[in-house]
A protein has these predicted regions:
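Adenine nucleotide-associated cytosolic modules
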Residues: 1-300
Length: 300
């Protein structure tokens, strides 16, 4: 148990309520990261907490001003990773409406403040599509994302989600950046219900080529190359040593163990980080494999 995190949920809920109250008092406007707005949110949080104590309802011993500050400062920001997470939650709740599963009957707060960079960073807006992301993580992180070279194996359901995420967050979208995608399969009618980048008119077309074209439409700055070759021992002439050596990390979005273990073996050999993930019905798994720090996929 993380004793330092006790009452963290209550602190988050109180901070969220303070932001909502701020909006109510300021014409539906979210607070900015100005000292004036943050101080106002902290004052509101303390008032709400005092009211909770008086009514013997939800309250905390002492309001955590830092939690309120962070919640207020980033309340205006919207980034693709958070949108995807909450989109998944909403989708699951819609499935639960059938009565087969138990719905969420309480507030759900997703706390990822620990992902914020330590120390001062340049968060000045650039007037670009990535401003919200820059406001949270800083310009240096955004520049690194833009220069990344990555290789994604598979352009099905997971692959479609990753292509969208890469395009929206600017991964491989800067000078020198590159996203390479391969899938030797073509789009079928049965794919359309879960591989959301594809439409009826795409049936029969290459998954990787189509996904990359649509990713480019989402963000014209996306530097993307599509391949149609299977990643296997007989295609080492396509995915050769210089190809693997040039990568910063690899993404598995395949649907079989054989392909996963082969890509895992390549990543072990060339010492490349691997993002492994998969889905099964309403369930999913993900695994980040870091050379010399974690087990490889085949060993886990």
């Amino acid at each position: 148990m993380k004793f330092m995190g006790m009452q963290r949920s209550e602190q988050l809920h109180l901070a969220f309520r303070a932001v909502l109250k701020f909006r109510e008092l300021n014409g539906s406007q979210f607070p900015s990261d100005s000292a004036e707005h943050i101080d106002e949110c902290i004052r509101i949080a303390n008032t709400l907490n005092d009211e909770g104590k008086a009514a013997e309802q939800l309250n905390v011993e002492q309001v955590d001003a830092e939690v309120v500050r962070l919640t207020a400062a980033y309340s205006r920001c919207s980034i693709t990773s958070m949108a995807a997470f909450f989109g998944g939650i909403v989708a699951q709740e819609i499935v639960k409406f059938t009565g087969k599963y138990s719905p969420i009957k309480q507030m759900l707060h997703y706390d990822v403040f620990e992902s914020l960079p330590e120390g001062p960073v340049n968060r000045a807006p650039r007037g670009c599509r990535y401003d919200d992301q820059i406001r949270i993580y800083g310009q240096e992180v955004q520049d690194k994302l833009g220069k990344i070279h990555t290789f994604m194996v598979g352009a099905g359901a997971l692959g479609c989600e990753y292509i969208k995420a890469f395009a929206m967050m600017g991964l491989g979208c800067g000078e020198g950046g590159l996203v390479q995608v391969t899938d030797n399969d073509n789009i079928e009618v049965s794919n359309l219900n879960r591989q959301f980048l594809f439409r009826k008119n795409n049936v029969g077309s290459s998954k990787s080529l189509t996904a990359c074209q649509i990713g480019k439409q989402m963000n014209p700055g996306l530097n993307v190359v599509a391949h149609t070759s299977l990643v296997a021992p007989n295609t080492v002439n396509v995915f050769n040593d210089p190809f693997w050596e040039d990568l910063d990390f690899v993404v598995n979005a395949v649907d079989n163990i054989k392909a996963r273990t082969y890509v895992d073996g390549r990543c072990v050999w060339f010492e490349k980080p691997l993002l492994e993930s998969g889905t099964l019905g309403t369930k999913a798994n993900s695994q980040m494999i870091i050379p010399h720090k974690t087990q490889c996929y085949s060993d886990s």
